[in-house]
Amino acid sequence: MRIKADISRQQVKTHHLLVCVTIRIFVYTNRKPFIRCHGGVKAMQFWQGDGPKPTEKLIVEKIRFHLLFSRSYDRNCISCLNFCINGIVLRIFFIINRNTR
């Protein structure tokens, strides 16, 4: 099984830092991927791919969620998402640089 992740994000500044993140997980497999996600998830929706086929094919799982960072000026904001895809862990770190002038 091969896994690739494509991440796009947009930032909205409020009294907290709200980051809307969309992850497309490309899974090359011969069975329907079982994905679990935990850590830093505010809201999440799943769009499921097709059912399993006898030969390996591309299944795209699109996951959209919001990360909420508290405003901190003395350090970087780090949030980690752990995806478990058919028993394989895909760990993604989001780092928001809070440097000030």
From Swiss-Prot:
Tree of life domain: Viruses
Stated name of the protein: Putative protein p25
Species of provenance: Acyrthosiphon pisum secondary endosymbiont phage 1
Encoding gene, per UniProt annotation: 25
